[in-house]
């Protein structure tokens, strides 16, 4: 029996060769492969195939079948590509990408379903890995709600609340503070990794690693001198943890070359490499050309628009406790905000030379906008046409910046960052019309945790008003979420929190070549007087955007 492509779409969703528009952007992904056997699709509902003896195998033990299946969904994943498949989940892990069902009645079955299996209908939806934000200032715990509502399931950073140190730096200093923050975050259904203060004090750094820190943050507000950089990286190398750095904007203790000499070829994650978020003025962006540096942006400068420059001056003064009545403070702020480097940053992202995107939450950036701004930038750069790549490659390049590359960088890619089998089932489902603004459902560790839900006194699930609400997985945080810690701190952190603690690993021998879709090492030159940036000998012309997709249309209500 043959049916039209249009009819197939109505019944089972798109298939191989179909194109899907993402939100109201100019980006159209194309399904590269459909892993589901035609004619044997599993569909839930009255008169459908997901019934006992049909798509569900009877008389089979629980351990032999999936706990959960997401059917006929389009998978958008930096390792798997753009494919159509079922997703099989067991014990909170993804165990199958392919075709689920009953092998006695269906062809091409990769994993078995039975009466113990729950079903989420994925027809017409997109599944991505849960997004990862590597630049979280723990100013307020309520950021968790905004992160979930934007598709984020793993947050990496530091802080203690609205203290001056936290409003400026992603640092949880000292073991006592780590204990307090870990106990507090234990009630929220996301994965967390806490960064402690990088310093010249070895004993202090070893103490925090033994008590649950996952790595270090070097920040100029606490001191980013060459001695601090060297000692922090020395300890990190011994304990296999990552170091993030916000370098010395005022060049007080050295210039970019001095920082690179202190780093001495060792792996480091460089934050907000454009410089508006902080870093050697005016040429920190040149760090993107270093093979041992894993570079990221923060979202306030992305994409560069007609309002970006003006917004940043006042924002910077507030975040870094600067006094507008002190000329030196004003000069410091103005040295960090440069339109020329913002333009270059847009181009470097599209080129694949900046490997990650993050928020800098409540400390210049917005935790709920990282996904939006990432794909606004992809839209803008496709529109400009400076780099000619197909939409699948461009979308996967930008998706990798907020999924697998942050996971690799921080030593947690064995657990999160992809939907590949063996990883934690942190899955975000999207209606393509709302990607990547508002997820349809967030699945955390195999449990539905955050979702759109209607009036709970109504007769059906989606009676107005439909709002994001915590689901049962939210209240089972200890079962579905994880802390990530230095190996030496796993045991002690496990005594503080209820949930499992997993070790970070394989962070110290990474290079830019380990960054998926984002491993380019261009030649970068910065004019110290005009701030003009040349990339591979060319000044890219990236004008500020006057309008963007994924904006007011999605926030009328």
Curated annotation (Swiss-Prot):
The active site is at 320 (proton donor). Its cofactor is Ni cation. One of its GO terms (cellular component) is cytoplasm. One of its GO terms (biological process) is urea catabolic process. The modification N6-carboxylysine is found at residue 217. Pathway: Nitrogen metabolism; urea degradation; CO(2) and NH(3) from urea (urease route): step 1/1. Belongs to the metallo-dependent hydrolases superfamily. Urease alpha subunit family. This is Urease subunit alpha. It comes from Sulfurisphaera tokodaii (strain DSM 16993 / JCM 10545 / NBRC 100140 / 7) (Sulfolobus tokodaii). The gene is ureC.
């Amino acid at each position: 029996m043959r049916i039209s492509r249009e009819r197939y779409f109505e019944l089972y969703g798109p298939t191989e060769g179909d194109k899907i528009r993402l939100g109201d952007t100019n980006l159209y992904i194309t399904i590269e492969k459909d892993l589901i056997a035609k004619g044997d699709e599993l569909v839930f509902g009255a008169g459908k195939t997901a019934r006992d003896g049909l798509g569900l195998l009877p008389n089979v033990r629980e351990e032999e079948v999936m706990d959960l299946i997401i059917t006929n969904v389009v998978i958008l994943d930096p390792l798997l590509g753009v494919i159509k498949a079922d997703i099989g989940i067991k014990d909170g892990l993804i165990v199958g990408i392919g075709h689920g069902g009953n092998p006695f009645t269906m062809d091409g079955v990769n994993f078995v379903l039975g009466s113990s299996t729950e079903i989420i209908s994925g027809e017409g939806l997109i599944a991505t890995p849960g997004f990862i934000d590597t630049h979280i200032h723990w100013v307020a715990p309520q950021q968790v709600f905004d992160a979930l509502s934007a598709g984020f399931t793993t947050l990496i950073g530091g802080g203690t609340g609205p203290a001056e140190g936290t409003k400026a730096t992603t640092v949880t200093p000292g073991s006592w503070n780590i204990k307090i923050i870990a106990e507090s975050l234990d009630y929220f259904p996301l994965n967390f990794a806490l960064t402690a203060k990088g310093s010249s004090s070895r004993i202090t750094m070893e103490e925090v690693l033994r008590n649950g820190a996952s790595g270090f943050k070097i920040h100029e507000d606490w001191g980013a001198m060459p001695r601090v950089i060297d000692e922090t990286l020395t300890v990190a190398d011994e304990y296999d943890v990552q170091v993030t750095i916000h370098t010395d904007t005022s060049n007080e203790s050295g210039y970019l070359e001095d920082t690179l000499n202190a780093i001495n070829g060792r792996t480091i994650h460089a934050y907000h490499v454009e410089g508006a978020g902080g870093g050697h003025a005016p040429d920190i962006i040149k760090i993107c050309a270093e093979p041992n540096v894993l570079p990221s942006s923060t979202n306030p400068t992305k994409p560069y628009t007609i309002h970006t420059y003006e917004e940043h001056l006042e924002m910077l003064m507030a975040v870094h406790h600067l006094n507008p009545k002190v000329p030196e403070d004003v000069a410091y702020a103005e040295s960090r905000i440069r339109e020329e480097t913002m333009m270059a940053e847009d181009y470097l992202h599209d080129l694949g030379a900046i490997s990650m995107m993050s928020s800098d939450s409540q400390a210049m950036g917005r935790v709920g906008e990282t996904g939006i701004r990432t794909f606004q930038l992809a839209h803008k750069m496709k529109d400009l046409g400076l780099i000619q790549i197909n939409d699948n490659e461009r979308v996967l390049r930008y998706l990798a910046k907020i999924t697998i590359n942050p996971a690799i960088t921080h030593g947690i890619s064995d657990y999160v960052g992809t939907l590949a089998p063996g990883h934690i089932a942190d899955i975000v489902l999207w209606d393509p019309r709302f990607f990547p603004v508002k997820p349809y459902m967030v699945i955390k560790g195999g449990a539905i945790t955050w979702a759109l839900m209607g009036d709970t006194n109504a007769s059906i699930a989606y009676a107005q008003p439909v709002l994001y609400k915590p689901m049962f997985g939210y209240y089972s945080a200890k079962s579905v979420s994880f802390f990530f810690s230095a190996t030496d701190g796993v045991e002690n952190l496990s005594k503080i929190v209820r949930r499992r603690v997993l070790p970070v690993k394989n962070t110290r021998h990474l290079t830019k070549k380990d960054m998926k879709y984002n491993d380019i090492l261009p030649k970068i030159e910065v004019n110290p007087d005009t701030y003009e940036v040349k990339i591979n000998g060319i000044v890219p012309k990236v004008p500020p955007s006057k309008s963007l997709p994924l904006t007011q249309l999605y926030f009328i209500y």
